[in-house]
Amino acid sequence: MSEAIKSKTVDYSSDEYLKRVDEYWRAANYISVGQLYLLNNPLLREPLKATDVKVHPIGHWGTIAGQNFIYAHLNRAINKYGLNMFYIEGPGHGGQVMVSNSYLDGTYTETYPKITQDKAGMKRLFKQFSFPGGVASHADPKTPGSIHEGGELGYSILHGAGAVLDNPGLIAATVVGDGESETGPLATSWQVNKFLNPITDGTVLPILNLNGFKISNPTVLSRESHEELEDYFKGLGWDPHFVEGTDPAKMHKIMAEELDKVIEEIHAIRKNAKDNNDESRPKWPMIVFRAPKGWTGPKSWDGEPIEGSFRAHQIPIPVDRNHMEHADKLVDWLKSYKPEELFDENGTLKPEIAAIIPEGQARMAANPVTNGGKLTKDLITPNIDDYALDNKSHGKEDGSDMTELGKYIRDLIELNKDNKNFRGWGPDETLSNKLGAAFEDTKRQWMEPIHEPNDALLAPQGRIIDSMLSEHMDEGMLEAYNLTGRYGFFASYESFLRVVDSMLTQHFKWLRNSHEETPWRADVPSLNVIASSTAFQQDHNGYSHQDPGIISHLAEKKTEYVRAYLPGDANTLIATFDKAIQSKQLINLIIASKHPRPQWFTMDEAKRLVRDGLGVVDWASTDHGEEPDVVFATAGSEPTTESLAAVSILHARFPEMKIRFINVVDLLKLKKDDPRGLSDAEFDAFFTKDKPVIFAYHAYDDLVKTIFFDRHNHNLHVHGYREEGDITTPFDMRVRNELDRFHLVKAALLATPAYAEKGAHVIQEMNSILDKHHDYIRAEGTDIPEVENWKWTALK
């Protein structure tokens, strides 16, 4: 660009400037099509041969030109207004968009020096797309500027919102696919404007890419009229701006005009909020961008429309190395962008076009927020000893684990209030999950009207977002908050974390790929998920609320990037959370009790359990370092309590029985194929090679069975959740699943040859008390006194 255009007097709406924008757009489109089809001859300087074309062109075209158009105009707005902006590519299967644009702006070459901005580099760029050993057809972690892959649809706005929290100068230009808009999470996420503060947070700018079609169907919103769409988005609290058309020349002018209005509207909102301390919810602008699917591509094929049709979705014309009979049509398409006007003899973008591209960190692909690990500040954490319950008399005192954790979280918020890099999320469950102490130092962030005393704990600024009953929203915002370098947690009912288990899978894939395949990405704070109101504490809500399967779901992944913690009491939970919240590049699942329970471990004991992942509990063992008769292993709150009660029964009846009691906190450390897993020798030192192991476990039995399959000791008896539940008493939940103390005693005696016969009378005693339990709860509606009044007695 000329010096005059670089000056402050530039007319960003002039025909000259928009001509350059159009040229840039054409260049991005050319490169995007080239990535689909070409191996060689990237600029078509020679006649196209079969060896120039891929054997299997793979990828998608339908969304590309529209997004490239949007990207080009966002660049223009960045230049005009000096914006701090990054791009989120919501539509599925549009990987070329961010690759092509980061290549044109130089970020791609800076990241991958072999992909040079010339003919040789363009050839490499084209070959690698959707190619073995190359790059994906989505904006995966290898893509500069991406924090959102867009493989599984529905999370674009949520990721934009999580990124702009506590980033008041940042704009997340979030392109939403009209197919994506039909997903549950995306339909929900239009409500994020009720949670973003115009003073302390940045701005999400949704751009609905209304191209009309999905894979083979029309999109719902595209068939609504202009008036219906306007009413719909206004009703959701947005101010929609429309850019609609098919003629590129006209669309450039419309887009420039409307985008200017949008940016000026954003600036006016922010200025008013800051100048007048006005934290009322503004009507943030958004853009409805209606242009044809497959815009600028082939108009038709074999008598049927392509542009403006679902047929533009993938590879629009059938040309590959083995089918070159229509190669001239591919050449016509590529040459329609006039590459000779865009690239010089070396294949480099012409300088007059490159001059309108933002520079340095102003480039969306180079925005520092998209490599958030480099922005991460260390979290300031409290001393966990300050929250220690005494517990020297093991089990003497009752307490709520989550209530105690709430005190730690309260102080974590206070310690990091200046850095503003810690938040919590929940779907209207923070109080229910007993984290109420956190509200001693903060409020729920909420931008809607507040009606006290009917409302409570709401404010325009707060470190907890839990006023939207959407697990998708919580998970999505936390993911982006982490990916942009900040810390947080998401606490929910255990069974309803299954709502987002596919989101957790997608985040796991991002963490793994970014760590293993993109050394230029710095590790980011871990995603911390607290599963409370667990299956065994849902006696009052019943069977629908009882599903502990989230741990099995995560354990199936590469566990180098997953931790599954099952703390047995409050001290262990606090030590676990303190470790998890400071970790990087992991998904930490913490399964935590919220109801009052006996408190077992001193803080020193808890620290050792969390450090080592498991440990022999000396005060609950009678083997004194010798080979035990039976091993009790526990993972979880109720399993620990019930196993200790079982040990006390056995010891009272058979004081000579040698029992080893193991508490497991970090379950996946037992896996042989986990990088942190115990060696066989270490495993055998805990569990022996052949002695019976009574493993009381919080979730489904099969996970523990799978873990032990690769170990020497197969004398395993797992008592977990066996899909038995109802509205009943707390103890009956354990009885139904044979996780209670009486079933555990029976299992231990039957599995230990020396005691199977001489313990027959005790087995009968256990059966009798189980019969009593059955009748008693149905008559009284509460658990038997033997359970309600039980206390741990030190073993002699």
From Swiss-Prot:
Q: Please state the span of the N-terminal signal peptide per the UniProt entry.
A: none
Instruction: Supply the EC number(s).
Output: 4.1.2.-
Q: Does the keyword Lyase apply?
A: yes
InterPro entries reported in the protein's UniProt record: Phosphoketolase, THDP-binding, Transketo_C/PFOR_II, Xul5P/Fru6P_PKetolase, Xul5P/Fru6P_PKetolase_C, Xul5P/Fru6P_PKetolase_CS, Xul5P/Fru6P_PKetolase_N, Xul5P/Fru6P_PKetolase_ThDP_BS
- Cofactors, names only: thiamine diphosphate
Q: Which UniProt keywords apply?
A: Lyase, Thiamine pyrophosphate
The enzyme's main class, written as a single word, is: lyase
What Gene3D superfamilies does the database record attribute to this sequence? Answer: 3.40.50.920, 3.40.50.970
Entry annotated with the keyword Lyase = yes
**A GO BP entry:** carbohydrate metabolic process
- CDD domains attached to this UniProt entry: TPP_PK
Quote the Pfam families the UniProt record gives. Answer: XFP, XFP_C, XFP_N
**Which molecular-function annotation in GO is an example for this chain?**
aldehyde-lyase activity
**Cross-referenced PANTHER family:** PHOSPHOKETOLASE-RELATED
Q: Which family does it belong to?
A: Belongs to the XFP family.
Q: Write the protein's name.
A: Probable phosphoketolase 2
Q: Which organism is it from?
A: Lactiplantibacillus plantarum (strain ATCC BAA-793 / NCIMB 8826 / WCFS1) (Lactobacillus plantarum)
User: Which taxonomic lineage is given here?
Assistant: Bacteria, Bacillati, Bacillota, Bacilli, Lactobacillales
